[in-house]
Amino acid sequence: MPTITSYFGFLLAALTITSALLIGLSKIRLI
């Protein structure tokens, strides 16, 4: 089903963006 695939892709993208933001915030706090 394309709906499940697109939903999984959107979830994966959101997770990647969230983790990237968290890593960026932690790096800024470390400096």
UniProtKB/Swiss-Prot annotation:
Pfam families: PetL. GO terms for cellular component: chloroplast thylakoid membrane; cytochrome b6f complex. It is a single-pass membrane protein. The chain crosses the membrane at residues 4-24. Its main location: plastid. It is found in: Plastid, Chloroplast thylakoid membrane. The keyword Manganese does not apply. The keyword Transport applies. Keywords: Chloroplast, Electron transport, Membrane, Photosynthesis, Plastid, Thylakoid, Transmembrane, Transmembrane helix, Transport. GO terms for molecular function: electron transporter, transferring electrons within cytochrome b6/f complex of photosystem II activity. Belongs to the PetL family. Component of the cytochrome b6-f complex, which mediates electron transfer between photosystem II (PSII) and photosystem I (PSI), cyclic electron flow around PSI, and state transitions. PetL is important for photoautotrophic growth as well as for electron transfer efficiency and stability of the cytochrome b6-f complex. This is Cytochrome b6-f complex subunit 6. It comes from Piper cenocladum (Ant piper). The lineage of its organism: Eukaryota, Viridiplantae, Streptophyta, Embryophyta, Tracheophyta. The gene is petL.
